[in-house]
Amino acid sequence: MRYEFSKTEAKWQAWWKEQNTFKTGDDADKPKYYVLDMFPYPSGTGLHVGHLEGYTASDITARYKRSCGYNVLHPMGWDAFGLPAEQFAIKTGTHPKTTTEENIRNFKGTLQAMGFSYDWSREINTTDPHYFKWTQWIFLKLYERGLAYMSEVDVNWCEELKTVLANEEVDEKIADGYTVVRRPLRQWVLKITAYADRLLADLDELNWPENVKQMQRNWIGRSEGVEIDFELRCHNKKLRVYTTRPDTLFGATYLVISPEHPLAEKLATAQQLVEVKNYISKAKLKTELERTGLQKEKTGVFTGSYAINPATGEPLPVWISDFVLISYGTGAIMSVPAHDSRDWEFAKQYNLPIIEVIQSPHDVQERVFEEKESICVNSANNEITLNGLPFCEAFERMASWLETKKAGERKVNYKLRDWIFSRQRYWGEPIPIKHYHDGTLRLETALPLVLPEVEAYHPSSTGESPLANIPHWLYGSDEHGSFRRETNTMPQWAGSCWYYLRFIDPENQEKLVDPEKERYWMNVDLYIGGAEHAVLHLLYARFWHKVLFDLGVVSSREPFKKLFNQGMILGEDNEKMSKSRGNVIPADHVLERYGADAVRLYEMFLGPLEQVKPWNTNGIEGISRFLSKVWRLVYGEHEESATLLSEEAMPEELLRRMHKSIKKVGEDTEQLKFNTAISEMMVFVNELQKSGCKNRSAIETLLVLLSPYAPHITEELWESIGHNYSISQAPFPSFDPKLVEESILTIAVQINGKLRGTFLAPAKSPKELLLQEAKKTESVFKFLDGQTILREIVVVDKLVNFVVKKE
């Protein structure tokens, strides 16, 4: 009887749905395990095989943990607000809601066809008013705590999309061919900087990949430095700069300010004013990426003004350059070209002085020297000397001297900036704020504030969202007077900042989440998703979670205990899958040809989960043959009914193999080493096939080990051998420690530490026996001939080493 995967998979998917097999209760008597995928944006292109990798890994973990006795929460939902649906609406007139619902049906169908054990009763959708009611509620709480405010700020404006982009989104959009410019706009901003220290400190508690934690540390960018005042010659003002290297003050030879600095035009002399104005105008058209790229040519303009170096008394020219950002530090820097590569390049380009103040092994006129480890030189005046001091001592001495002279003060700075939260588009959560004619703002109290129906989805001519074109929704009045609703909507990140909490209590209309359920289920034990979200979703979600912690809504400081980033699956051409390359492998096509179990096993067998690897159709053919081999263990080649299994004891060699497989598969599954777990199951299947053994215990053990990976075929075979309950309810087997020990071991023989041969010996053999066998080994015997043995070293079960010298 051949294995027909399409019939089997359809049968068991229908049965799981009918039986609510994976519906999760809030059973506080059982240990819990919360495993979560980064929920998808349901795009019109559907899922390809690369998307399935993380979902498969989380499902294997969920099924394995259930078999280990855990109450497992494994939910799925949709991050469904977003720009693509709105762009499609602009082109076609199709309401984004219609497009989104159709895309969700397609996505859900694919996920169900993969046999993923999600509790679909907890399904959420960020565009559902019952859901975004609570997204809006969180925004109001942020506003009440002073963490949401309005400001006219320079934003990243995408002309083609007619909307603002967060700093973190700019790189991707430019790479996609969009034009991004800077322009001032009234925006809602979230004060994420108020949580910078906590976001930084709590990273140490997390079981996350170190590279992701480091990316967040770099993005937050905490630095300790000094703000220094430079007297401006001829202006009776001071220019304050921020530096992390006050120890190099004696080497500062020029200052640079941002084009947006309030003194930029004021410092321009009459001769320089036109050039300065032109430079500032051009700089404002550039994105931060264009301005700060390390590879770009440095540009600048001299203001004509000078400032006095407080350490040397020398006048320093004040320049304007677009690589200095007004949003970081004070928007002004001191430049020490001998010891900073960017300053060195700028100095070389504009023929500015370069003075060595950190002892360098080479000529700093020819090459910059940036190491901190060396000592200070050429750094003394009548009041202070740094000469001979290492960095830390020089930093402290200079900082103290500047504070004593009231010429500076210690300061902590962050690269992290407040989160520009509003978007000029329709398909997003309305911001629940009313603007009254007297200038006051009041909160919408009747939540959810839902989106109105519109005929046109184009942004308004003023740069506002399409909501500005709908008078009946836009204007209103109440006991406080006439008002105009906020027309900006929230970014797509809003709904994903807290969705993991709603899965815990999705039907609750009175609270965001029931406190008792939250205490039971949180934190998320395992969160699986791509590393591309390191400084976007993951940072924003941590910020909102900390606010909710301060509000008493959640009981933990962090949402995600363990994070795992799966590697990308490339196309067969070893390139990232994309429509433009024509190398996308749609998930539905592969499922139709090979079935879900083969796809699940193949994707996990490709290599370590965290590594990038290419798809290979020949490989999945091999997995299909493996599944057929498993099938034949129960059905045989030509039998229409399952083979009668034996209750007789299995051979000892097979018994040992089985217990080794239990141990290996369990340990590897626990550690997400799925490829090696599958390899071990293949070894076990080969041993079963070779032995011809039809022992019930052996077959049942194999099926339970394999069931998290290939749930459909194992359910079918489990039923075929006489079980009337789901294999997902079968406990994971335990191994006998005595049976996993090797009975015959390979012992290495060394002479003077060099491997000269090996031999086989029973485990726990006495030292005397090991020495005898080692000396009799043919390849070793010839090396001992004519040698005097000075010492014999025996490590039981591992090696024998002879220390010798020539006679």
Swiss-Prot record:
Ion transport among keywords: no
InterPro entries: aa-tRNA-synth_Ia, Leu-tRNA-ligase, Leu_tRNA-synth_edit, M/V/L/I-tRNA-synth_anticd-bd, Methionyl/Leucyl_tRNA_Synth, Rossmann-like_a/b/a_fold, tRNAsynth_Ia_anticodon-bd, Val/Leu/Ile-tRNA-synth_edit
UniProt keyword annotations, A-Z: Aminoacyl-tRNA synthetase, ATP-binding, Cytoplasm, Ligase, Nucleotide-binding, Protein biosynthesis
Domain of life, per lineage: Bacteria
Cysteines engaged in disulfide bonds, as pairs: none
Cellular component annotations (GO), alphabetically ordered: cytosol
Positions with a binding annotation for ATP: K579
Catalytic reaction annotation: tRNA(Leu) + L-leucine + ATP = L-leucyl-tRNA(Leu) + AMP + diphosphate
'HIGH' region (motif): residue ranges: 40-51
TM ranges: none
Main localization category: cytoplasm
GO function terms (MF aspect): aminoacyl-tRNA deacylase activity; ATP binding; leucine-tRNA ligase activity
Cell location: Cytoplasm
Motif residue range(s): 'KMSKS' region: 576-580
Any GO BP: leucyl-tRNA aminoacylation
EC number: 6.1.1.4
Entry-linked PANTHER family: LEUCINE--TRNA LIGASE, MITOCHONDRIAL, LEUCYL-TRNA SYNTHETASE
Family stated for the protein in its record: Belongs to the class-I aminoacyl-tRNA synthetase family.
NCBIfam families: leuS_bact
Protein name: Leucine--tRNA ligase
